Amino acid sequence: MTKWFNVGKIVNTHGVKGEIRVVSRTDFPEERYKVGNTLYISNEKGGEPFPVKITSHRQHKTFDLLTFEGYGNVNEVEQFKGSLLKVPEDQLGELAEGEYYYHEIIGCNVVTEEGEALGTIKEVLSPGANDVWVIKRPKGQDLLIPYIDDVVLQVNIENKLVTIHVTEGLL
């Protein structure tokens, strides 16, 4: 069975020439939405996602605007509103060392270099220069950890374990 990953959500149409407005959920929109690439539309009714080929991509405000081969007007793409854009796992591509997909990080247990368990990563935020990992603690408020070399010492995806150095003021 194919494992699917969300890369965007179709929130509306744009204009009358078949453009769709996408809220992107990928770190690599230029690569993911490149003309000629194939994405898969998964509608709200379920069922197997079906392929569409990208014929144009541009950015408009906070959205990515896409057109698909064979869908040349607004009436043909209206049906896609609310649908998700997905890719199969084999289209994710390799990342450089020290880079991870969100689905690999979320669910990892976090410990200090002394071995003290802090909690589990529940979310990844991208507020600016670096990602911030949100750690759900067993008790108390969530902990925010910046993904920088001074703090994150080791990431072991296979064992779902992240080791951090606690700097002053972090806890």
UniProtKB/Swiss-Prot annotation:
Record's subcellular location: Cytoplasm
Keyword Membrane set for record: no
Claim: rRNA processing is one of the keywords in the record: yes
NCBIfam families: 16S_RimM
UniProt domain PRC barrel: residue ranges: 97-170
Name by which UniProt lists this protein: Ribosome maturation factor RimM
Predominant cellular place of this UniProt entry's protein: cytoplasm
Gene: rimM
Disulfide-linked positions: none
UniProt organism field: Bacillus anthracis
Pfam families: PRC (PF05239), RimM (PF01782)
GO BP of this protein: ribosomal small subunit biogenesis; rRNA processing
Quaternary structure annotation from Swiss-Prot or TrEMBL: Binds ribosomal protein uS19.
Gene Ontology MF term list: ribosome binding
Entry-linked InterPro entries: PRC-brl_dom, PRC_barrel-like_sf, RimM, RimM_N, RimM_N_sf, Transl_B-barrel_sf
Notes concerning its domains: The PRC barrel domain binds ribosomal protein uS19.
Protein purpose: An accessory protein needed during the final step in the assembly of 30S ribosomal subunit, possibly for assembly of the head region. Essential for efficient processing of 16S rRNA. May be needed both before and after RbfA during the maturation of 16S rRNA. It has affinity for free ribosomal 30S subunits but not for 70S ribosomes.
Keyword entries, A-Z: Chaperone, Cytoplasm, Ribosome biogenesis, rRNA processing
Similarity annotation: Belongs to the RimM family.
Gene Ontology cellular component annotations, sorted alphabetically: cytoplasm; ribosome
HAMAP family: Ribosome_mat_RimM (MF_00014)
